[in-house]
């Protein structure tokens, strides 16, 4: 009888240890995967910051910022450093943050066809809630002018001088408390230089 009780206690102990180990492993696995996803998204956002910072006039003479909405931004920038200015289209589609690009026509005058030529994934597992856009835009009065900043969207492209990028990343829906926010402010260098020259 004592042997049966000892075996039962031992079995319960093993089952408890196995359950504890399993839960710990699942928790660590989730943390590790979320960390990987956040790191990859952070690298993608850093690239976007560089492209936006170096926005410039399109090869067809277009203003550096083509359109500026909550989850959609179109600028001109030489993203692949080949001396040719591409039209870059940053937008959210489902849980992905994407960049579409389009090179200008080879002949003269230069033109940009409609639509994106190709698309690159900037970040995955994006979980921004409704009412939390990816892009916020600020005019030249920021940070002193907090009443008119961030500017209303879709923004008047002539007003945009500073862009805030905010994405929230999570590998599991329904765990909003674990969302990892990644935020960065970027000044459009060519436009701020223009403000200094014009003043």
Positions of the model-derived regions?
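Aliphatic-rich helix starts adjacent to a transmembrane/signal segment
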Residues: 1-54, 197
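Generic macromolecular interface patches on structured domains
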Residues: 27, 58-59, 175, 196
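Short linear sequence signals and composition-biased patches located at protein termini or domain-edge surfaces
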Residues: 33, 81, 127-199
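Alpha-helix exit/C-cap motif
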Residues: 43-67, 82
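Short, surface-exposed charged micro-motifs
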Residues: 64, 87-89, 185
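A generic fold-level signal
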Residues: 67-68, 160
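Type IV pilin-like appendage domain
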Residues: 68-148
């Amino acid at each position: 009888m004592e042997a049966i009780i000892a075996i039962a206690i031992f079995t319960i102990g093993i089952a408890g240890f196995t359950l504890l180990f399993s839960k710990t492993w699942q928790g660590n696995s989730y943390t590790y995967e979320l960390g990987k996803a956040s790191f990859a998204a952070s690298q993608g956002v850093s690239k976007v910051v560089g492209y936006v910072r170096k926005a410039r006039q399109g090869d067809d003479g277009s203003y550096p910022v083509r359109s500026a909405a909550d989850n959609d931004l179109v600028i001109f920038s030489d993203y692949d450093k080949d001396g040719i200015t591409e039209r870059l289209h940053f937008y959210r589609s489902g849980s992905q943050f994407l960049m579409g690009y389009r090179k200008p026509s080879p002949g003269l005058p230069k033109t940009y066809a409609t639509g994106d030529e190709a698309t690159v994934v900037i970040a995955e597992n994006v979980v921004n809630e409704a009412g939390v856009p990816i892009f916020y835009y600020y005019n030249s009065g920021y940070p002193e002018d907090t009443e008119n900043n961030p500017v209303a969207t879709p923004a008047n492209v002539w007003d945009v001088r500073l862009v805030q990028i905010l994405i929230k990343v999570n590998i599991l829906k329904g765990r909003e408390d674990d969302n990892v926010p990644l935020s960065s402010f970027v000044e459009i260098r060519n436009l701020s230089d223009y403000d200094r020259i014009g003043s």
